[in-house]
Amino acid sequence: FLLGAAVAHPLIPERFSARMRMQLLSSQPSLHARLRVTASRRHAAPEGGACGDTGAIEKAPDGRVILLLADGMGTGEGARRLSRRALALAREFLECGLNEFTAYRAINRLSDGGREAFSTLDVCEIDPVTGTARFHKCGSEPTWLLRGRTARRIEGASLPVGVVAEATPSVASAHLRPGDAIIMATDGLVNALGGEPAAEAWFQTLSTLSPAAFCTASLKEARSRNRAARPDDMSILCARIQKRSPLLDRAPALPDPIPDDPPAAQPDTAAGP
Protein backbone atom coordinates (compact mmCIF):
# COMPACT_ATOMS: atom_id res chain seq x y z
CA PHE A 1 0.00 0.00 0.00
CA LEU A 2 2.71 2.46 0.98
CA LEU A 3 4.72 1.77 -2.14
CA GLY A 4 1.63 2.26 -4.30
CA ALA A 5 0.88 5.55 -2.59
CA ALA A 6 4.43 6.73 -3.14
CA VAL A 7 4.19 5.88 -6.81
CA ALA A 8 0.74 7.14 -7.66
CA HIS A 9 -0.53 9.70 -5.16
CA PRO A 10 -1.20 12.92 -7.10
CA LEU A 11 -0.43 15.17 -4.13
CA ILE A 12 3.11 13.87 -3.67
CA PRO A 13 5.66 15.75 -5.85
CA GLU A 14 7.61 13.49 -8.16
CA ARG A 15 10.97 14.17 -6.52
CA PHE A 16 9.59 13.15 -3.12
CA SER A 17 7.75 10.09 -4.41
CA ALA A 18 11.00 8.89 -6.00
CA ARG A 19 12.79 9.22 -2.68
CA MET A 20 9.94 7.43 -0.87
CA ARG A 21 10.12 4.54 -3.32
CA MET A 22 13.85 4.24 -2.78
CA GLN A 23 13.53 4.32 1.00
CA LEU A 24 10.70 1.77 1.04
CA LEU A 25 12.58 -0.60 -1.22
CA SER A 26 15.93 -0.14 0.53
CA SER A 27 15.06 0.40 4.19
CA GLN A 28 16.44 -2.97 5.29
CA PRO A 29 20.23 -3.49 5.34
CA SER A 30 21.46 -5.85 2.68
CA LEU A 31 22.08 -9.37 3.95
CA HIS A 32 24.62 -9.82 1.18
CA ALA A 33 26.94 -6.99 2.23
CA ARG A 34 30.41 -8.30 2.90
CA LEU A 35 32.18 -5.10 3.92
CA ARG A 36 31.77 -2.61 6.72
CA VAL A 37 33.07 0.96 6.67
CA THR A 38 34.18 3.03 9.66
CA ALA A 39 35.13 6.63 9.07
CA SER A 40 36.13 9.80 10.87
CA ARG A 41 36.96 13.37 9.92
CA ARG A 42 38.73 16.36 11.43
CA HIS A 43 38.67 20.06 10.58
CA ALA A 44 40.86 22.95 11.73
CA ALA A 45 40.65 26.69 11.03
CA PRO A 46 43.34 29.37 11.57
CA GLU A 47 43.18 30.93 15.02
CA GLY A 48 39.88 29.29 15.84
CA GLY A 49 37.89 31.06 13.11
CA ALA A 50 35.24 29.53 10.87
CA CYS A 51 36.55 26.66 8.77
CA GLY A 52 35.89 26.99 5.05
CA ASP A 53 35.95 23.20 4.62
CA THR A 54 32.96 20.91 5.11
CA GLY A 55 32.83 17.13 5.34
CA ALA A 56 30.21 14.42 5.70
CA ILE A 57 29.93 10.67 6.19
CA GLU A 58 26.59 9.41 4.88
CA LYS A 59 24.70 6.18 4.38
CA ALA A 60 22.33 6.22 1.41
CA PRO A 61 18.98 4.40 1.52
CA ASP A 62 20.32 1.71 -0.82
CA GLY A 63 23.21 0.92 1.54
CA ARG A 64 26.01 2.84 -0.17
CA VAL A 65 28.40 4.72 2.11
CA ILE A 66 29.17 8.21 0.77
CA LEU A 67 32.21 10.20 1.93
CA LEU A 68 32.25 13.90 1.03
CA LEU A 69 34.78 16.69 1.50
CA ALA A 70 34.42 20.24 0.14
CA ASP A 71 36.75 23.26 0.27
CA GLY A 72 35.14 26.65 -0.40
CA MET A 73 37.07 29.42 -2.13
CA GLY A 74 38.91 31.59 0.40
CA THR A 75 38.60 31.27 4.16
CA GLY A 76 36.12 32.06 6.90
CA GLU A 77 32.34 32.32 6.74
CA GLY A 78 32.18 32.97 2.99
CA ALA A 79 34.20 29.87 2.19
CA ARG A 80 32.18 27.81 4.62
CA ARG A 81 28.90 28.82 2.95
CA LEU A 82 30.25 27.80 -0.45
CA SER A 83 31.53 24.42 0.73
CA ARG A 84 28.36 23.66 2.70
CA ARG A 85 26.18 24.46 -0.31
CA ALA A 86 28.22 22.29 -2.68
CA LEU A 87 28.28 19.40 -0.23
CA ALA A 88 24.56 19.64 0.56
CA LEU A 89 23.66 19.51 -3.14
CA ALA A 90 25.98 16.58 -3.79
CA ARG A 91 24.62 14.67 -0.82
CA GLU A 92 21.01 15.27 -1.90
CA PHE A 93 21.48 14.19 -5.51
CA LEU A 94 23.75 11.21 -4.84
CA GLU A 95 21.57 9.81 -2.07
CA CYS A 96 18.61 9.91 -4.46
CA GLY A 97 20.55 7.64 -6.80
CA LEU A 98 21.41 10.06 -9.61
CA ASN A 99 24.50 9.09 -11.57
CA GLU A 100 27.48 11.32 -10.93
CA PHE A 101 27.44 13.11 -14.28
CA THR A 102 23.79 14.15 -14.01
CA ALA A 103 24.27 15.09 -10.36
CA TYR A 104 27.27 17.35 -10.94
CA ARG A 105 25.73 19.10 -13.92
CA ALA A 106 22.80 19.96 -11.67
CA ILE A 107 25.14 21.12 -8.89
CA ASN A 108 27.04 23.38 -11.28
CA ARG A 109 23.85 24.91 -12.64
CA LEU A 110 22.58 25.59 -9.12
CA SER A 111 25.88 27.05 -7.91
CA ASP A 112 26.92 30.70 -8.14
CA GLY A 113 29.05 30.40 -11.25
CA GLY A 114 30.13 33.70 -12.77
CA ARG A 115 30.60 35.41 -9.41
CA GLU A 116 33.91 33.73 -8.63
CA ALA A 117 32.16 31.65 -6.00
CA PHE A 118 33.15 28.02 -6.21
CA SER A 119 34.13 25.02 -4.12
CA THR A 120 36.15 21.88 -4.63
CA LEU A 121 34.26 18.64 -4.10
CA ASP A 122 35.76 15.26 -3.30
CA VAL A 123 33.39 12.29 -3.10
CA CYS A 124 33.80 8.56 -2.61
CA GLU A 125 30.84 6.19 -2.95
CA ILE A 126 31.39 2.73 -1.45
CA ASP A 127 29.16 -0.26 -2.21
CA PRO A 128 29.57 -2.71 0.71
CA VAL A 129 27.95 -5.52 -1.31
CA THR A 130 30.27 -5.49 -4.32
CA GLY A 131 33.26 -3.87 -2.60
CA THR A 132 33.46 -1.23 -5.33
CA ALA A 133 34.44 2.38 -4.64
CA ARG A 134 33.79 5.21 -7.09
CA PHE A 135 35.70 8.45 -6.69
CA HIS A 136 34.36 11.77 -8.05
CA LYS A 137 36.79 14.66 -8.05
CA CYS A 138 36.01 18.30 -8.81
CA GLY A 139 39.12 20.42 -8.36
CA SER A 140 40.13 18.51 -5.23
CA GLU A 141 43.39 17.12 -3.92
CA PRO A 142 44.25 13.47 -4.61
CA THR A 143 42.57 10.70 -2.68
CA TRP A 144 44.83 7.98 -1.33
CA LEU A 145 43.94 4.30 -1.19
CA LEU A 146 46.25 2.60 1.30
CA ARG A 147 46.69 -1.17 1.11
CA GLY A 148 49.37 -2.66 3.31
CA ARG A 149 52.66 -0.97 2.42
CA THR A 150 51.40 0.43 -0.87
CA ALA A 151 49.55 3.66 -1.67
CA ARG A 152 47.51 4.39 -4.78
CA ARG A 153 47.02 8.08 -5.57
CA ILE A 154 43.68 8.85 -7.24
CA GLU A 155 43.75 12.20 -9.04
CA GLY A 156 41.44 14.22 -11.25
CA ALA A 157 41.69 17.24 -13.54
CA SER A 158 38.12 18.54 -13.35
CA LEU A 159 37.19 22.09 -12.34
CA PRO A 160 35.67 22.96 -8.95
CA VAL A 161 31.88 23.10 -8.87
CA GLY A 162 30.38 26.46 -9.76
CA VAL A 163 32.96 27.43 -12.39
CA VAL A 164 31.35 26.05 -15.57
CA ALA A 165 27.73 24.91 -15.76
CA GLU A 166 28.41 21.88 -17.97
CA ALA A 167 31.54 20.66 -16.17
CA THR A 168 31.60 17.03 -15.06
CA PRO A 169 33.80 15.33 -12.46
CA SER A 170 36.84 13.17 -12.97
CA VAL A 171 35.73 9.64 -12.06
CA ALA A 172 37.79 6.61 -11.04
CA SER A 173 36.96 3.30 -9.42
CA ALA A 174 38.67 0.69 -7.28
CA HIS A 175 37.85 -2.69 -5.80
CA LEU A 176 38.23 -2.61 -2.02
CA ARG A 177 39.53 -5.27 0.34
CA PRO A 178 39.31 -5.62 4.12
CA GLY A 179 42.13 -3.62 5.68
CA ASP A 180 42.15 -0.89 3.02
CA ALA A 181 42.06 2.76 4.07
CA ILE A 182 40.75 5.72 2.05
CA ILE A 183 42.24 9.16 2.78
CA MET A 184 40.70 12.43 1.58
CA ALA A 185 42.23 15.80 2.48
CA THR A 186 41.99 19.46 1.50
CA ASP A 187 44.90 21.44 0.07
CA GLY A 188 45.55 23.19 3.39
CA LEU A 189 46.51 19.93 5.05
CA VAL A 190 48.39 18.48 2.07
CA ASN A 191 50.44 21.67 1.67
CA ALA A 192 51.16 21.86 5.39
CA LEU A 193 52.57 18.33 5.26
CA GLY A 194 54.94 19.41 2.47
CA GLY A 195 53.01 18.56 -0.70
CA GLU A 196 51.59 15.39 -2.19
CA PRO A 197 54.69 13.11 -2.00
CA ALA A 198 55.39 14.13 1.60
CA ALA A 199 51.74 13.73 2.57
CA GLU A 200 51.63 10.29 0.98
CA ALA A 201 54.75 9.20 2.85
CA TRP A 202 53.24 10.45 6.11
CA PHE A 203 49.93 8.68 5.51
CA GLN A 204 51.74 5.39 4.92
CA THR A 205 53.30 5.57 8.38
CA LEU A 206 49.79 5.63 9.88
CA SER A 207 48.22 2.88 7.79
CA THR A 208 47.33 0.67 10.78
CA LEU A 209 45.65 3.37 12.89
CA SER A 210 41.92 3.73 13.42
CA PRO A 211 40.25 6.49 11.36
CA ALA A 212 39.96 8.80 14.37
CA ALA A 213 43.59 8.33 15.40
CA PHE A 214 44.72 8.73 11.78
CA CYS A 215 42.96 12.07 11.39
CA THR A 216 44.10 13.41 14.76
CA ALA A 217 47.73 12.47 14.14
CA SER A 218 47.69 14.00 10.65
CA LEU A 219 46.32 17.36 11.84
CA LYS A 220 48.84 17.45 14.67
CA GLU A 221 51.71 16.71 12.28
CA ALA A 222 50.50 19.30 9.76
CA ARG A 223 50.44 21.99 12.46
CA SER A 224 53.92 21.08 13.65
CA ARG A 225 55.39 21.27 10.12
CA ASN A 226 53.68 24.54 9.27
CA ARG A 227 54.40 26.79 12.26
CA ALA A 228 56.21 29.48 10.26
CA ALA A 229 53.69 29.76 7.40
CA ARG A 230 50.33 31.49 7.26
CA PRO A 231 47.87 28.78 8.29
CA ASP A 232 45.05 27.66 6.02
CA ASP A 233 41.91 25.65 6.71
CA MET A 234 42.88 22.00 7.06
CA SER A 235 40.59 18.98 6.80
CA ILE A 236 41.04 15.24 6.55
CA LEU A 237 38.68 12.29 6.27
CA CYS A 238 39.77 8.69 6.78
CA ALA A 239 37.70 5.54 6.14
CA ARG A 240 38.70 2.01 7.06
CA ILE A 241 37.31 -1.03 5.23
CA GLN A 242 36.57 -4.07 7.35
CA LYS A 243 35.11 -7.49 6.81
CA ARG A 244 31.49 -7.46 7.88
CA SER A 245 30.69 -9.24 11.14
CA PRO A 246 27.12 -10.02 12.28
CA LEU A 247 28.17 -8.87 15.76
CA LEU A 248 28.71 -5.33 14.42
CA ASP A 249 25.49 -4.97 12.42
CA ARG A 250 23.87 -2.51 14.82
CA ALA A 251 25.66 0.65 13.77
CA PRO A 252 25.16 3.91 15.67
CA ALA A 253 23.20 6.65 13.96
CA LEU A 254 25.22 8.84 11.64
CA PRO A 255 25.74 12.43 12.81
CA ASP A 256 24.34 15.49 11.09
CA PRO A 257 26.62 15.78 8.04
CA ILE A 258 26.66 19.58 7.97
CA PRO A 259 26.94 20.94 11.52
CA ASP A 260 26.86 24.69 12.09
CA ASP A 261 30.52 24.52 13.05
CA PRO A 262 32.62 21.66 11.63
CA PRO A 263 33.92 19.75 14.67
CA ALA A 264 37.56 19.83 15.61
CA ALA A 265 37.17 16.20 16.60
CA GLN A 266 34.52 13.69 15.60
CA PRO A 267 34.55 10.08 16.81
CA ASP A 268 34.67 7.18 14.42
CA THR A 269 31.36 6.67 12.68
CA ALA A 270 30.32 3.19 11.69
CA ALA A 271 28.53 2.95 8.39
CA GLY A 272 27.43 0.21 6.12
CA PRO A 273 25.21 -2.79 6.78
Tell what function each PLM region has:
Residues 1-29, 80-149, 155, 169, ...:
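Catalytic core of PPM/PP2C metal-dependent serine/threonine phosphatase domains
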Residues 42-49, 111-115, 132, 162-166:
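Short, solvent-exposed secondary-structure boundary motifs
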Residues 10-73, 78, 84-88, 167-173:
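N-terminal entry segment of metal-dependent catalytic domains or homologous docking segments
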Residues 65-69, 135-136, 182-185:
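Short hydrophobic-aromatic micro-motifs
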Residues 74-96, 165, 176, 180-229, ...:
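Active-site-proximal, acidic helix/loop segment immediately C-terminal to a metal-coordinating Asp/Glu
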